[in-house]
Amino acid sequence: MDLNISTALRSFTQRYIDLWQQQTGHLPASKELYGVPSPCIVETGEDQVFWQPQAFLPEATLTNIERALEIQLHPDIHDFYTQQYAGDMMADLGNHRFTLLQVWSEDDFIRLQENLIGHLVTQKRLKLSPTLFLATTSSEMTMASLCNVSGNVVLEQFGSDKRTLLASTLSHFLDALRPVLPE
């Protein structure tokens, strides 16, 4: 049975939080997000913030992108980016390490939409089929993305048609991820 995106994302997020609490005794922490306002912040330390996910309110969609580019986005991407505010989360899948991108705040949601538009415009200019990024890797040119046509999750080289299947659906991708702590 295919989990819905909301359930799969909540499940992965909880596994990530559980790992942090087991390994460190506290909620996930971020030095990179220190000083950046967010509804996720539970506590601010000397040089880091401790966070936990919060409901994405008010409800939102990525219809601004659809209108701007006259494209219908795969429904899974709406669900993925509008379920929760959270910090980015690290995970492994096979021999790949990913940073799963999340929305930190309302301002971050605006930036995300601008970046997705830029990504889609670049793909259109290069005559590539549209994808929507989900996670980064250690290489600036490689990312995990949702294929807007098939709904597959692929490992893609930015600006190239080189793509490797990671999972048949986004929910399968999220379910297969193994959370890891940042190094």
Swiss-Prot record:
Asked whether the UniProt record includes Membrane among its keywords, one would answer: yes
Q: Does the keyword Oxidoreductase apply?
A: no
Membrane topology label: Peripheral membrane protein
Give the GO cellular component terms, alphabetically: cytoplasmic side of plasma membrane
The record ties this protein, via InterPro entries, to:
Syd, Syd_sf
Tell me which family the UniProt entry assigns to this protein.
Belongs to the Syd family.
The protein's name is Protein Syd
Question: Which species is this record about?
Answer: Yersinia pestis
